[in-house]
């Protein structure tokens, strides 16, 4: 803030105008305010903020429906579903979802299991590396591997043909891609 005051005082040389007044004048003349903050090793990071007027619809998102363009909150807007979908889960607006399986368990067990999946490569589309959730409220530090499929049929074939150890938890679902 002190740097902004100093820069603005150089632009507005009047001694009779207070610092808050200088800032208000500057922001009135420059709708895109630039904020500068100091970061490590004497470098600077600059961020420009431009606010769009509330009455202007957001056209950058292809998922808007006519209901959302009328400025309803997202929570009150209807959930979009695909009419030709074979699953009953929630689908995003372009129906670009894929069936998935999360395998949860010991990290080393999942890593070895991932390599055993290579001989069943026709039964899944992709398999992730071993990952885990982080955060303050995470109670279980179990590792996770995610598998994606082209269809629910392919996922069912995978689950019926591939032996999963009893120590691994299997969760099925859908993921937007």
UniProtKB/Swiss-Prot annotation:
Subunit comment: Interacts with host NCoR/SMRT components GPS2, HDAC3, NCOR1, NCOR1, TBL1X and TBLR1.
Locations listed in the record: Host nucleus
Keywords carried by this UniProt record: Host nucleus
Family under the similarity heading: Belongs to the papillomaviridae E8^E2C protein family.
Main localization category: host cell
Keyword Transmembrane helix: no
Gene Ontology MF annotations: DNA binding; DNA-binding transcription factor activity
Role summary: Plays a role in limiting the replication of viral DNA in keratinocytes. Recruits the host NCoR/SMRT complex to viral replication foci to mediate repression of both viral replication and transcription.
Gene Ontology biological process terms, A to Z: regulation of DNA replication
Lineage: Viruses, Monodnaviria, Shotokuvirae, Cossaviricota, Papovaviricetes
UniProt-recorded name of the protein: Protein E8^E2C
Record SUPFAM superfamilies: Viral DNA-binding domain
Signal peptide residue numbers: none
A single cellular component GO annotation: host cell nucleus
């Amino acid at each position: 803030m002190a740097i902004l005051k100093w820069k603005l005082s150089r632009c507005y040389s009047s001694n009779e105008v207070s610092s808050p007044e200088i800032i208000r004048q500057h922001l009135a003349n420059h709708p895109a305010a630039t904020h500068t903050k100091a970061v490590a090793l004497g470098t600077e990071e600059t961020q420009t903020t431009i606010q769009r007027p509330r009455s202007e619809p957001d056209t950058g998102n292809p998922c808007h429906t006519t209901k959302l363009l009328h400025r309803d909150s997202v929570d009150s807007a209807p959930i979009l579903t695909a009419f030709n979908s074979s699953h009953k889960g929630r689908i995003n607006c372009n129906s670009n979802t894929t069936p998935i399986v999360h395998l949860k368990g010991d990290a080393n067990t999942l890593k070895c299991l991932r390599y055993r999946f290579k001989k069943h490569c026709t039964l899944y589309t992709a398999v992730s590396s071993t990952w885990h959730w982080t955060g303050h409220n995470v109670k279980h530090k179990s590792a996770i591997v995610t598998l994606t499929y082209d269809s629910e049929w392919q996922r069912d074939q995978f689950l019926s043909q591939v032996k999963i150890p009893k120590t691994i938890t299997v969760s099925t679902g859908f993921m937007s891609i």
